[in-house]
Amino acid sequence: MALVTLQRSPTPSAASSSASNSELEAGSEEDRKLNLSLSESFFMVKGAALFLQQGSSPQGQRSLQHPHKHAGDLPQHLQVMINLLRCEDRIKLAVRLESAWADRVRYMVVVYSSGRQDTEENILLGVDFSSKESKSCTIGMVLRLWSDTKIHLDGDGGFSVSTAGRMHIFKPVSVQAMWSALQVLHKACEVARRHNYFPGGVALIWATYYESCISSEQSCINEWNAMQDLESTRPDSPALFVDKPTEGERTERLIKAKLRSIMMSQDLENVTSKEIRNELEKQMNCNLKELKEFIDNEMLLILGQMDKPSLIFDHLYLGSEWNASNLEELQGSGVDYILNVTREIDNFFPGLFAYHNIRVYDEETTDLLAHWNEAYHFINKAKRNHSKCLVHCKMGVSRSASTVIAYAMKEFGWPLEKAYNYVKQKRSITRPNAGFMRQLSEYEGILDASKQRHNKLWRQQTDSSLQQPVDDPAGPGDFLPETPDGTPESQLPFLDDAAQPGLGPPLPCCFRRLSDPLLPSPEDETGSLVHLEDPEREALLEEAAPPAEVHRPARQPQQGSGLCEKDVKKKLEFGSPKGRSGSLLQVEETEREEGLGAGRWGQLPTQLDQNLLNSENLNNNSKRSCPNGMEDDAIFGILNKVKPSYKSCADCMYPTASGAPEASRERCEDPNAPAICTQPAFLPHITSSPVAHLASRSRVPEKPASGPTEPPPFLPPAGSRRADTSGPGAGAALEPPASLLEPSRETPKVLPKSLLLKNSHCDKNPPSTEVVIKEESSPKKDMKPAKDLRLLFSNESEKPTTNSYLMQHQESIIQLQKAGLVRKHTKELERLKSVPADPAPPSRDGPASRLEASIPEESQDPAALHELGPLVMPSQAGSDEKSEAAPASLEGGSLKSPPPFFYRLDHTSSFSKDFLKTICYTPTSSSMSSNLTRSSSSDSIHSVRGKPGLVKQRTQEIETRLRLAGLTVSSPLKRSHSLAKLGSLTFSTEDLSSEADPSTVADSQDTTLSESSFLHEPQGTPRDPAATSKPSGKPAPENLKSPSWMSKS
């Protein structure tokens, strides 16, 4: 389509009927001059020139000095026709018609003038040009438009106009031209009826002037008159189209659908209605000659739909170029803003409307998406100003419709499908091209991504998970937070390798996946990537699970699972863990939520290995890492810090989602606070494994599924472990390699401080399961050192951290008492003490059975079982099951340790067997103590938040209850203390009176001093058990800090 706007007037007016002015008198020389110039406001397309409604200005300069090159000969012809008119008359529309002569050019011209009553009067002129290049024209027909004028489509690509007994048929050269002619004629007939221009009346007398000017050749006049009899110049349909009988309704529906499709796909400027009907017949494979009237009516209806602007929203119209050129319609609809989404159409009324142009063509390669943002703001500008905006292109089908769909998607947050259906419902001819549809789909993704930034899925889901049922399964995406580089944790490469069931955990830096045979589903596989903190916490959750759940292979955490589970539920929508590891998963998931480290997740496996060697890097990369000032003191839970610089117990129990380093590692019993309140990261894991395994041997029947739900205990070194997980032979990690156990006897008896630092700081994962298993199984004869060391730990941790942990420790006890758990556990444990140990039943599936296969027969030493009595004795009572859960969870914790696990393996193996035995036994009672004191109900924890001072009132009473229940109140499993502080241990009188005699105390002090001295000796961290003596290439930063640490100790 060629749009030509000829020297548009800057002062357009809305009055369509005021085109002629009374001051213009015929014959006036000035007016004659004005009429010599062509109108400045004609809108031209191929085959039609539409007068843009001007105000008081006459049709201006009649001479077109620089005609538009792409408008064909229409501008020149229009200029000649205007010069043919009287000065007071104006052309409203000129439409080119088909001609029987190839070289002849014919126009139907609608001319209007002011009548006797200053009303608009219209006539039709038939103008002939002898050739396209002709500079002159003649009039061959004059037809007055009286009030009885009727217009009909002839079904052959034209329309008939009948009035006062005369009928003429006009066949415009294009559908677009015909549609513009029908519009103008319709309005002209309406004016004639309104003013009652009856035939033969005084109106339209001025038409006699043009009747007197008829001077065309007779052949031309005959063509104008003979057209009433002319059916069509189109030949009949080919014979191959055989008439098929069809049902009327079905055919009409099919015609409507096909016709609409054809008209939207055709360039209506270059096709006639005959051609459209031909195409329709071809597509339908039938002759539609009988239905041509129906087809024409439908075509007219579709043209009307295409031409009429569609009100999409209260402030937004979607239309075509014709709507943009109809000043009266624009002003009547309240449009003040026009968004022109075309390159070929100019702005018609730049002085009257606010325009914004998107200069693009309707092509699939056009990048329309880049303009949608500015279009959105322009449309909203109209909305803010309480006005309306017209968005138009050529037909209002593709470009402008796509822009409106994009606007709806952004403005209302709709998906593409909804926005498209809505706009198509409002404007049925809407059909964006394939390229625009692809861009709309891309735009939908952009908007979705923008919304996701504010979506709760990209934040910690504290609020939503509070309302989530505990046993309501949630997909992995429900709780996987985004890693710092934007990658969901489930998509990290080394996580995918870990998804194989039954394999040891390959994940580095305190993370691993609980991938066992009982966790085969994608939910469990993907969702169980967690941060293992202290086995004590796991034991807490296990303790709170009822016995019935313990026997099920797929147990789910119960409502009263306790403090840890409550916090987990507040952080995660994580509801379908299997077995005992269900609670573990929740605790660990909470750790992961708190402790996602930017570097920890973003690093490659080689960088992860560096993290294993460098706890400072771990701390720096972890959101949960302690401040640098606290690193040295956090080695063993800050044993000697009476008031650590952590904020509060409430802050620790309810860590912020941001995971500030200080807040996320505060000293309290929060399951998510690993560093201070919980068990020592090193000792409990050393001890938990043998305890758990001995316990499991004596209570296999009650816990048939606890083993399989936990990863295998023996893991290859960090590097090989990653390889194993991805390889087919990863199952080898399930069995303890000889190279893993043997170096434990040969390595020097030194545990580097860096390992301890790493353990207490970040790993919180059981470090040295395998060595402890190996070593613990042999020395079970000497029970005295065990009690010594246990007292040592208990008393040491009691004294210096009284203000820090007792408050938190007793806080939970108060809540336990509210829940009635302390009394129940006390009774059950007292009864447990009196129950003799059963012989070990047959081994069960899972890591525990594999583990005990590696434990020498000494592990069934009755003395050892007796020492573990309260924990390992089977019982049918619910609390017995819960008490058994503690060692099992300890076992799970130690089994699922991350790569740092191996470094401690090597150095832990350097302990004397007696020492290992004693520390293995140390946490048994304190483990139950931890479980009891920290298994407060989920509901009761809310009453504690922000009120840490309440727990001091009943400290002594609670401690007494624990001792009577056979539990020590020692802190190893509760407070994440570190062996590094053993040299400065002191005793609390309560613990001495509870479990110690003078000789025990003395021996334990000696043992502590010796162990503390060798623990202080820094040493490079080996990369795997086989290379125990190989120092790490880069010393851990904690080693560099050893002087300050030693001074503090």
Curated annotation (Swiss-Prot):
Chain intervals with Basic and acidic residues compositional bias: 564-573, 772-787
Listed GO MF terms: actin binding; phosphoprotein phosphatase activity; protein serine/threonine phosphatase activity; protein tyrosine phosphatase activity
Post-translational modification: Phosphorylated. Inhibitory phosphorylation by PAK4 promotes binding to YWHAZ. Phosphorylation at Ser-978 is decreased by stimuli which promote actin reorganization and lamellipodia formation. Can be dephosphorylated and activated by PPP3CA/calcineurin A. Phosphorylation decreases immediately prior to telophase.
Domain DEK-C: 249-304
Outcome of mutating C393S: Abrogates phosphatase activity
Effect recorded for S937A: Reduces binding to YWHAB, YWHAG, YWHAQ and YWHAZ. Abolishes binding to YWHAB, YWHAG, YWHAQ and YWHAZ and increases association with F-actin
Biased composition (Polar residues): 1-12, 458-468, 1001-1013
Keywords from the UniProt entry: Acetylation, Actin-binding, Cell projection, Cytoplasm, Cytoskeleton, Hydrolase, Phosphoprotein, Protein phosphatase
Oligomeric form and interacting partners: Interacts with actin and this stimulates phosphatase activity. Also interacts with LIMK1 and with the 14-3-3 proteins YWHAB, YWHAG, YWHAQ, and YWHAZ. Interaction with 14-3-3 proteins inhibits phosphatase activity and also blocks recruitment to lamellipodia and stimulation by actin.
Protein name: Protein phosphatase Slingshot homolog 1
Origin species: Homo sapiens
